[in-house]
Amino acid sequence: MDAAGGVSSVRSITAIFLVAYGLLQLPLNALAEATPSQIKSIRAVRTDDVPVLDGRLDEALWNQAITVVDFHEVSPNEYEKPSEETRFYVVYGKDALYIGAQFTDSEPEGIVAKVMRQGDFSEGEDGLKVILDPFNNGRSGYVFQLTPNGIRGDGLFRNVTDINWDWEAIWDAATTIHDTGWTAEIAIPFKTLSFSPENDTWGINFTRTIGRRKEDIGWESYNRSQNPANSGRLTGLTGIEQGLGLDIVAGARVSDTKEFNSPQADVSDTQFEPSLDLFYKPTPSLTAALT
């Protein structure tokens, strides 16, 4: 082989090596982006105050809270800049996790809030969702949703793709629609959730929906999806307890019937049916219900 041929071969080998090295770096960089150190995280702030839930965010407690502002569009264009400013606030006390939301809207008259009955939701409404994974295992957890009208919904993740919407939680929330958007205040009692008191890190995620634009805005997401597997982290939860693990919820149903085509048309039959729901947690990861 002559000298020119030798130089050409060396150059070819060098070029092949550089291309191969570059290709190898692509998955390595992708893996680096997916490492736990890159997962968003917030540290919990503890307070002795208990907010009065009116949806106004005007109490000093919210000035102590951690503020979450680094949101992106989840749908339709994942990771694009959201169309509206979105803020969530997180703080906790001895008995509950408190979450506030401040949603700026440049067209507040366009806020979609149709349903007025608890438990019912309509496609295309504005709203928010909070996902909690108390065991931080990326497989289980809870979802709490709320509309501008204060309509609440909750579900239990059987796995990352299956939610049991029949699960009923004990929690409270209030909302206010105003001339710059809408705000919300949420209180989730720790006795509602199953968790290990020794675990101070939970999975957490936030979503805002702008109904008229069919836009979902989120904190963490992957492939336009939000679930326990792709949530952020809430750290520093210390000194919290589940209590006795027994919750009692009393209720009643009143019905009134009247037969119009009978001799006793003026007589009505009123029935009162009391009810009692018992929720018991024999272990941190198991809840039993009895009605």
Where are these regions (language model features)?
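In a subset of proteins, long, contiguous C-terminal domains/tails are tracked
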Residues: R11-T14, A101
